[in-house]
A protein has these predicted regions:
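Active-site neighborhood of HAD-like aspartate-dependent phosphohydrolases
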Residues: 2-51
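Helix-loop "lid/cap" segments that line or gate small-molecule binding pockets
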Residues: 35-36, 56-70, 127, 159-160
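Short helix-capping segments at alpha-helix termini
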Residues: 37-42, 68-70, 109, 132-136, ...
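Metal-dependent phosphoesterase signature
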Residues: 62-104, 109
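Residue-level detector of anion-binding/catalytic polar loops
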Residues: 42, 112, 189
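Hydrophobic/aromatic residues within well-ordered alpha-helical segments
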Residues: 28, 53-57, 77-85, 120
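Asp-based, Mg2+/Mn2+-dependent phosphohydrolase catalytic module
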Residues: 1-12, 47, 107, 120-121, ...
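Substrate-recognition element of Asp-dependent hydrolases with the DxDx(T/V) motif
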Residues: 20, 32, 99-129
Length: 226
């Protein structure tokens, strides 16, 4: 998408994590696929897991076993998945092309940045500590930092509180409709990352974000840079 305007008075950029800054689908998929292999089932290709990576354990178990959270086996499978994933958090996880350069530009412009994710702190903290990309992040809010996860605005409002900024001066970027819903409810300008897990198969324009980007670096078109 080509920029026709810039967001004014933005002092911080907040991002969703999986599918927006990093591609964790290979590790999420591998953690779920190990469960199949351990049971003598055929391995599934990453392409089967990738579209559901944004849904975490729920999505991975749905692909691997066709089960929903209502199934009596789901909780046990979820804990097994978590254990597998914990052992390989960053084995094959990487930042999307252009993300490192985007963050460097944001920092260089004197803006603050951070992460607001539905991923629990059990995984968010060791993952972000293991990846140099996050060394300059001012705030990291996990899915269990506040009593409510996205699409509730509470996590985004908590990030703004920690940054000591009003929400209106914080932009939120995410690759799922719940990100846009949460950002709008928090009073933040929103940007849909159409390059994420859902962007190819979903009409991101229907989310009614303030802007849409098809690559990380295009976000700079919407920021007032020095």
């Amino acid at each position: 998408m080509t920029s026709t305007f810039v967001f004014k008075d933005i002092d911080a950029v907040l991002f969703d994590l999986d599918g927006t800054l990093i591609d964790s689908a290979p590790d999420l998929g591998a953690a779920a696929d190990k469960m199949r292999i351990d049971r003598g089932m055929a391995s599934l290709p990453l392409a089967d897991y990738r579209p559901m990576a944004g849904a975490g354990a729920r999505g991975m178990i749905a692909v691997a076993f066709g089960l929903t959270p209502e199934h009596p086996r789901f909780e046990a499978l979820k804990e097994e998945f978590f254990s597998n994933y914990e052992e390989r958090l960053t084995a094959m996880t990487y930042a999307f092309d252009g993300v490192a350069e985007l963050i460097a530009s944001i920092v260089g412009a004197g803006l603050k940045w951070g992460v607001v994710t539905n991923k629990s702190a059990r995984f968010t903290l060791p993952l972000t500590q293991a990846m140099p990309l996050f060394e300059t992040a001012y705030v990291i809010v996990s899915g269990d930092t506040t009593p409510h996860a996205k699409p509730h605005p509470a996590p985004l409002l908590e990030a703004a509180r920690q940054l000591e900024m009003v929400p209106q001066r914080c932009m939120y970027v995410g690759d799922d409709e719940r990100d846009i819903v949460a950002g709008r409810a928090a009073g933040m300008p929103t940007v849909a990352a159409a390059y994420g897990y859902l962007g190819v198969s979903v009409d991101t324009a229907a989310w009614k974000a303030d802007a849409i980007i098809t690559a990380p670096g295009l976000l700079l078109n919407f920021l007032r840079m020095p």
